[in-house]
Amino acid sequence: MAINKVSSKPVCRDGVKKVVVAYSGGLDTSIILSWVKENYGCEVVACCVDVGQGKELEGLDEKAKKTGASKSYIIDAKKEFVTNYIYPTIKVNALYENKYYLGTSLARPIIAEKIADVVKKEKADAVCHGATGKGNDQVRFELAFKSLMPNVKIIAPWREWDIKSREDAIDYAKKRDISVPVTKAKPYSSDANLWHISYEGGVLEDLENEYDESMFKMTVSPEKAPDKPMYLAIAFEQGIPVSIDGNKFTPVELITKLNEIAGANSIGRADIVENRLVGMKSRGVYESPAAAVLYAAHEELESISIDRDTLHFKQLLAHKYAEIAYYGLWFSPLREALDAFINETQKYVTGSIKLKLYKGNIIIVARQAKYSLYSEKLATFEKDEIYNHKDAEGFINLWGLPTKMQAMLRKSE
């Protein structure tokens, strides 16, 4: 944890003496540091949680200080982000609306968790976030804050100030000489972490506009991807990825390595119109290369390691689990209960899946499972000594009895 202190004794009012701001250095939180200090007359502490933003964190301490923070915390939470948030979601194969790998949804609760620690340490009266009044993040942050520190005041500037658009926010920053990473010409809102990068706003709000190729940071276009396919094998132990091509990596290293490999082969791009929690539809463009590969490999390993009934029921729960994460309910009893069930299903999900990556496509080419339920002798169309074809007749008669009875009764009417 890095802390940068600046001498500051602001005049307090309204009972709020100190506020911890969830700080990223982006447009919204950059102007919020200044706005909170101006409008609440209190001490402002900036807290940035590192979940894999990379270069976005460079110079953040100095920037926070220049913008009005008395202290700035940068907390490295990358390992916890992977082990406590990403890995459980891989075990479930949770996709929101069958498309979204939940990159932002998973980052918000761990950011809130670390900010809550700083609020307690600083004995702050309030916590502040930069989520807009139209987005999902306001719900995710505030439900997490209420779960972790129910008695702390929450300040949401986008629901208080006169700034109505990103253009207004850019003007506010310009008047106060606050450096921000967007312009009116390219007002994209982006969110980056180990698991993905998301892009929203600007020209993307018109559904007829194709995204600009220059926007992408983690992946190349299919046209620029290698003409030769890339092969790799992902090994899992009890549902958790542990190695690539036999080489073991730490959780953060594994995700980072897969992002590089898959991104170079144009894996993991998605242009989605999704249903926001607050009721509207919105368009988001995402890069999730490691997520796409790990989900594909894990799902394939499960197909040979888990029995039919458990697998089918688990697939139903995956949809609900994705909603829980997306809707900001990570700290709910239901999510904890589902994790207990999911962990039980993963006891025998150990093995390796070989994949071929080619110009945006993920192709499964080989499977090995320590506890495989697949039997070549039983599945073969050639002669075998286990399966008696005559047994099928009795099974079909019993299985089809309700169908037969329904048809007979309807015919007699």
Curated annotation (Swiss-Prot):
For this protein, the record's Pfam families field holds: Arginosuc_syn_C (PF20979), Arginosuc_synth (PF00764)
Query: Which of UniProt's keywords are assigned here?
Result: Amino-acid biosynthesis, Arginine biosynthesis, ATP-binding, Cytoplasm, Ligase, Nucleotide-binding
Annotated catalysed reactions: L-citrulline + L-aspartate + ATP = 2-(N(omega)-L-arginino)succinate + AMP + diphosphate + H(+)
Q: Does the keyword Repressor apply?
A: no
Give an example GO cellular component term for this record. Answer: cytoplasm
What GO terms are given for molecular function?
argininosuccinate synthase activity; ATP binding
Which CDD domains does this UniProt record tie to the protein? ASS
Q: What is its EC number?
A: 6.3.4.5
Query: What processes does the entry annotate via GO biological process terms?
Result: argininosuccinate metabolic process; L-arginine biosynthetic process; urea cycle
Name the source's superkingdom.
Answer: Bacteria
**Where L-citrulline is bound, by residue?**
100, 105, 136, 140, 189, 198, 274, 286
Q: Where is the signal peptide?
A: none
Q: In which pathway does it act?
A: Amino-acid biosynthesis; L-arginine biosynthesis; L-arginine from L-ornithine and carbamoyl phosphate: step 2/3
Matching InterPro entries: Arginosuc_syn_C, Arginosuc_syn_N, Arginosuc_synth, Arginosuc_synth_CS, Arginosuc_synth_type_1_subfam, AS_cat/multimer_dom_body, Rossmann-like_a/b/a_fold
HAMAP family tied to this protein: Arg_succ_synth_type1
What does the annotation say about its assembly with partners? Homotetramer.
Q: Report what the protein is called.
A: Argininosuccinate synthase
- The organism encoding this protein is Endomicrobium trichonymphae
